[in-house]
From Swiss-Prot:
Gene Ontology, cellular component aspect: cytoplasm
Keywords of this entry: Acyltransferase, Amino-acid biosynthesis, Cytoplasm, Diaminopimelate biosynthesis, Lysine biosynthesis, Repeat, Transferase
Domain of life, source organism: Bacteria
Residue sites binding substrate per the record: 104, 141
Organism the protein comes from: Shewanella amazonensis (strain ATCC BAA-1098 / SB2B)
Pfam family, one: THDPS_N_2
Signal peptide: none
Keyword Cytoplasm carried by entry: yes
EC class (word): transferase
Assembly, per entry: Homotrimer.
Lineage, top ranks: Bacteria, Pseudomonadati, Pseudomonadota, Gammaproteobacteria, Alteromonadales
Listed name of the protein: 2,3,4,5-tetrahydropyridine-2,6-dicarboxylate N-succinyltransferase
InterPro entries referenced in this protein's UniProt entry, alphabetically: DapD_Trfase_Hexpep_rpt_fam, Hexapep, Hexapep_transf_CS, THP_succinylTrfase_dom1, THP_succinylTrfase_N_sf, Trimer_LpxA-like_sf
Gene name of the encoded protein: dapD
Chief place where the protein resides: cytoplasm
Xref: PROSITE patterns: HEXAPEP_TRANSFERASES
Length: 274
C-alpha cells in the first residue's frame, strides 16, 4: 500500500502534464485501483482513529488525478444519455447484487463510481459524488447532494435538498464530515470540511462553512468548523463588533445526549425554549 501511495503522490506532482492520451499505463492502473477500493469501502478518504479524524490526502489526490486521466464517454441512462469522465456506480448491478448489498435506489438517483454506499441505505432522487463514503442505515433524501470525498456516518438523515460540500470545486484541504446519528434539516448546507459531530440535529435552512460562527447560547462559546456532539442547531444572527448590524450565525440552542435523543422526536428537539 505504501508503494501505491508513493506512486500516486508522484503522479499528482506531475499532473499538469497528464492527459487521457499521454498518461502512463501504470499511473492509470494505480488510479483505477484506488477508485475501485474506494467504491468497495476498502479504503476511505478520511477515517476516525482514536477519536480524531485523519485525512488520507493521497486518496484524495487519486480522485483528483482521475479527472485528468479518464476521458469523457457516453453513459447510458435509461431514457437519456450522458457524456462524462466518471461511470455510474450501479451501471453493472443486477437485482441479486442490489439485494446482497441491501440498498434501495430510487430513480433518478445518481451515484458515481468510486463512492461507497453502506447496507440498509436509502437513496431517494439524490446525487453522491465519487470518493464519498455513506455508511449503513443512512437516508439521502430527495435532491440532497453528497459532495466528493464527503464522509457520512451511520444512521444519518440528510433531508430534502441538503448540500454536503465536496473537496474538488473549490479544492478543500479536508472533506466535510457528518458523524453517526445526525439529522440535517431540509435545504441546509454543510461545506468546506466542517465536522458535524455525533448525534447533532441541524434545523432546516442552516448554512455552515469554516467561517460561520457557531454560537453556543448556554456557554457563550463560539466554534468554527465544528459542531460539538449532541448539538441542536438553528440559523440566527450575532451582533457585529460595531453593534450597527447583525451577521449570520448558527446557534446551538441546546444539547442532548443519546438517551434523550432516542426518546424525543426531532421536531420536539427543534422547538426553542426562550
Amino acid at each position: 500500500m505504501e508503494a501505491l501511495r508513493q506512486r500516486i503522490e508522484a503522479a499528482f506532482e506531475a499532473r499538469a502534464n497528464i492527459t487521457p492520451s499521454s498518461v502512463e499505463p501504470g499511473v492509470r492502473a494505480d488510479v483505477e485501483t484506488v477508485i475501485n477500493m474506494l467504491d468497495k469501502g476498502e479504503m476511505r478518504v478520511a477515517e476516525k482513529i482514536d477519536g480524531q479524524w485523519h485525512v488520507n490526502q493521497w486518496l484524495k489526490k487519486a480522485v483528483l488525478l482521475s479527472f485528468r486521466i479518464f476521458d469523457n464517454g457516453v453513459i447510458e441512462g435509461g431514457e437519456t444519455k450522458y457524456f462524462d469522465k466518471v461511470p455510474m456506480k450501479f451501471a453493472d448491478y443486477d437485482e441479486a447484487r442490489f439485494r446482497a448489498e441491501a440498498i434501495r435506489v430510487v430513480p433518478p438517483a445518481a451515484v458515481r463510481k468510486g463512492s461507497f454506499i453502506g447496507k440498509n441505505t436509502v437513496l431517494m432522487p439524490s446525487y453522491v459524488n465519487l470518493g464519498a463514503y455513506v455508511d449503513e442505515g443512512t437516508m439521502v433524501d430527495t435532491w440532497a447532494t453528497v459532495g466528493s470525498c464527503a464522509q457520512i456516518g451511520k444512521n444519518v438523515h440528510l433531508s430534502g435538498g441538503v448540500g454536503i460540500g465536496g473537496v474538488l470545486e473549490p479544492l478543500q484541504a479536508g472533506p466535510t464530515i457528518i458523524e453517526d446519528n445526525c439529522f440535517i434539516g431540509a435545504r441546509s448546507e454543510i461545506v468546506e470540511g466542517v465536522v458535524v459531530e455525533e448525534g447533532s440535529v441541524i434545523s432546516m435552512g442552516v448554512y455552515i462553512g469554516q467561517s460561520t460562527r457557531i454560537y453556543d447560547r448556554e456557554t457563550g462559546e463560539i466554534h468554527y468548523g465544528r459542531v460539538p456532539a449532541g448539538s441542536v442547531v438553528v440559523s440566527g444572527t450575532l451582533p457585529s463588533s460595531c453593534g450597527k448590524y447583525n451577521l449570520y450565525a448558527a446557534i446551538i440552542v441546546k444539547k442532548v445526549d443519546e438517551k434523550t435523543r432516542g426518546k424525543v422526536g426531532i421536531n420536539e428537539l427543534l422547538r426553542i425554549v426562550d
